[in-house]
């Protein structure tokens, strides 16, 4: 599946574009972009690298960029955005307020933002950070796809039960915008499913369908 998914070849061409501390520093709001969010230690970097077949997260971790929105160009009209992954409960209140203000502004104002991938550690799901992200997505009617990461840390049955439990709560509170799946970067579990979501949000599946119909 991965070899046929158009997102793979496109992501291998990804290049760092710009880092932004606030919305007015972001690239022009045109085309399509997909953002990646996750609390510290939720596996965001591993998921981003695994889905894109590129070491994009390494760029985001360079000094001075860890608390910024990091943009990567896939082509002239498509981008990925690595959002800051704070140890949410541990950051100083002023920094937390600054981050909340600018991240909420980004999520609510970017017309080009097609969706958000939210990484949740399957062993510690629905943290305050996760709920905040889901609330913001719902307020903006923004699609959000939850990757329940580190699924390999639990036995298969336990992982499925955890998914069902979280899915019930998410559907009750944020079901109109949120979808969920199991994910493990080391085992490559759920990679194809997540890549299809990414390709759909970036309009790649529409292009493939148009090319097929024209042929």
Curated annotation (Swiss-Prot):
Protein purpose: Necessary for normal cell division and for the maintenance of normal septation.
Biological process, per Gene Ontology: division septum assembly
PANTHER family: ENGB-TYPE G DOMAIN-CONTAINING PROTEIN, MSS1/TRME-RELATED GTP-BINDING PROTEIN
Record-annotated EngB-type G domain positions: 30-204
One function term, GO molecular function aspect: GTP binding
Ranges in coiled-coil conformation: none
Similarity remark: Belongs to the TRAFAC class TrmE-Era-EngA-EngB-Septin-like GTPase superfamily. EngB GTPase family.
Chain sites annotated for binding GTP: 38-45, 64-68, 82-85, 149-152, 182-185
Provenance organism: Pseudomonas aeruginosa (strain ATCC 15692 / DSM 22644 / CIP 104116 / JCM 14847 / LMG 12228 / 1C / PRS 101 / PAO1)
Gene transcribed to yield this protein: engB
Names of the cofactor(s): Mg(2+)
GO cellular component terms, A-Z: cytosol
HAMAP family: GTPase_EngB
Keywords associated with the record: Cell cycle, Cell division, GTP-binding, Magnesium, Metal-binding, Nucleotide-binding, Septation
Residues that coordinate or bind Mg(2+): 45, 66
TM region(s), chain numbering: none
PROSITE patterns: G_ENGB (PS51706)
Protein name per Swiss-Prot or TrEMBL: Probable GTP-binding protein EngB
Annotated InterPro entries: G_ENGB_dom, GTP-bd, GTP-bd_ribosome_bio_YsxC, P-loop_NTPase
Upper taxonomic lineage: Bacteria, Pseudomonadati, Pseudomonadota, Gammaproteobacteria, Pseudomonadales
SUPFAM superfamilies tied to this protein: P-loop containing nucleoside triphosphate hydrolases (SSF52540)
